[in-house]
Amino acid sequence: RYPGTAVARFLARYTAKLAPTALHFEAARKLGFFDVSPRWKDFSYELCLDATMAMSTAEGYYPAWDGMLMKRFDSFIPDKIPVTIIFGDTDRTLPATTCQERSVAPNHAKWIIFPNTGHAPMWDSPLDVIDEIKKTVALAS
């Protein structure tokens, strides 16, 4: 039942008061972000603190997770609605072997795997994510 990020949620929730000081140290950033990203060392203090505080106060975290369990593309999505699915090649939260099922996505979906990118592509590959969003929006116009 627990998501792959349950440990991160637990750590964030119970260390939130320490985070503003602790995240100045590489060991604390590694503890919180090593499993999320291969580029965790490049993350700014602000990104780590914002993510930690958001995770620690997200009361809807488990209800949202529960709501997504076993949810798939379960109804027809017309070809005129562009669908882009982005994963990182080192995503340990939703690994390719168990969670990236192309067969359940619409046939017309564009499937992208960013290299050297973890569970949060917007952190690891922000410019690439922006580019793909722009391309997808252009298709919808």
What spans do the regions from the language model cover?
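Catalytic histidine-centered segment of alpha/beta-hydrolase-like enzymes
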Residues: 93, 114-130
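Alpha/beta-hydrolase-fold serine-hydrolase catalytic core, especially in secreted/extracellular enzymes
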Residues: 141
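Flexible "cap/lid" loop of the alpha/beta hydrolase fold
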Residues: 1-17
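Hydrophobic "lid"/C-terminal helical patch
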Residues: 129, 133, 137
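Short glycine-/acidic-enriched loop or helix-start segments at secondary-structure transitions
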Residues: 1, 95-97, 123
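Conserved alpha/beta-hydrolase catalytic His-Asp/Glu region
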Residues: 20-77
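Conserved serine/cysteine hydrolase catalytic core
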Residues: 57-104
